[in-house]
Amino acid sequence: MRIFAVFIFMTYWHLLNAFTVTVPKDLYVVEYGSNMTIECKFPVEKQLDLAALIVYWEMEDKNIIQFVHGEEDLKVQHSSYRQRARLLKDQLSLGNAALQITDVKLQDAGVYRCMISYGGADYKRITVKVNAPYNKINQRILVVDPVTSEHELTCQAEGYPKAEVIWTSSDHQVLSGKTTTTNSKREEKLFNVTSTLRINTTTNEIFYCTFRRLDPEENHTAELVIPELPLAHPPNERTHLVILGAILLCLGVALTFIFRLRKGRMMDVKKCGIQDTNSKKQSDTHLEET
């Protein structure tokens, strides 16, 4: 505010010099997270004399740029603009005091003042509005009850200002969903809007969730297509391995049993053969004695 008071004095002091600052636009509407450049024009004849130029940019009570006699003083820059705001010095020779702000925040909205002294002095106001659209909509579809084919549809997005969510079917019927609004964890002023719809439906049916914001008026819509119901017990690689292991185990047990059974039979046959031989020998011996 002290800088602004000094410039008012300088403006009246140099009125006779007819030094005038102009602005190509006095209103900028920019998107959250984007980069913006706002401009103030001042008269330059022939070659620019940096030693005679003073440029100030401020927003309400925040100092953004203080450029005096060819040097920029970053020590006075407000902390919220550090590493984000800069004066485009290559534009000064063209009579353009352009302020560039990167990664625009919601708190960057407000009234900016450019104050320029160059032989004379003048200032202009520029209004900046920040728009945070609900254009990145996350969606989810869950099966609540496979028997009744009840599904839970969810849409979630962040933006500013607040928005309502309207659910519609493919035949444009408006449906009743439940919407909750909380503050975003990314930035204090952003709203996190989540809406849920529970409905009995069938495969390939289409539903729409629309985020409607009134000021400024803007709509963003996401399409949700109902997928096929999953199998009650979907096969997977682990199941296949378990089944294969069980089959191999059973096969191993069966082969072992068969092998032992055959071995036992062979032993019985061999024993029978030995017994027959012994019996025959005993018979022959008995005959010889007789």
UniProtKB/Swiss-Prot annotation:
Q: List the disulfide bonds.
A: 40-114, 155-209
GO MF, one term, reads: receptor ligand activity
Coiled coil feature spans: none
Identify the residues that the record assigns to the Ig-like C2-type domain, covering every copy: 133-225
Bilayer topology annotation: Single-pass type I membrane protein
**Organism domain of life:** Eukaryota
Q: Which PROSITE patterns match?
A: IG_LIKE
Keyword ATP-binding belongs to the record: no
Which segment of the chain is annotated as a signal peptide?
1-18
- Describe the PTM: Ubiquitinated; STUB1 likely mediates polyubiquitination of PD-L1/CD274 triggering its degradation. Ubiquitinated by MARCHF8; leading to degradation. Deubiquitinated by USP22; leading to stabilization.
Q: What residues are glycosylation sites in this protein? A: 35, 192, 200, 219
Which parts of the sequence lie on the Extracellular side of the lipid bilayer? 19-238
- Localization terms from the record: Cell membrane; Early endosome membrane; Recycling endosome membrane; Nucleus
Role description: Plays a critical role in induction and maintenance of immune tolerance to self. As a ligand for the inhibitory receptor PDCD1/PD-1, modulates the activation threshold of T-cells and limits T-cell effector response. Through a yet unknown activating receptor, may costimulate T-cell subsets that predominantly produce interleukin-10 (IL10). Can also act as a transcription coactivator: in response to hypoxia, translocates into the nucleus via its interaction with phosphorylated STAT3 and promotes transcription of GSDMC, leading to pyroptosis. The PDCD1-mediated inhibitory pathway is exploited by tumors to attenuate anti-tumor immunity and escape destruction by the immune system, thereby facilitating tumor survival. The interaction with PDCD1/PD-1 inhibits cytotoxic T lymphocytes (CTLs) effector function. The blockage of the PDCD1-mediated pathway results in the reversal of the exhausted T-cell phenotype and the normalization of the anti-tumor response, providing a rationale for cancer immunotherapy.
UniProt-recorded name of the protein: Programmed cell death 1 ligand 1
* Organism annotation: Homo sapiens
Per the UniProt record, the lineage of the source organism begins with: Eukaryota, Metazoa, Chordata, Craniata, Vertebrata
Gene this protein is translated from: CD274
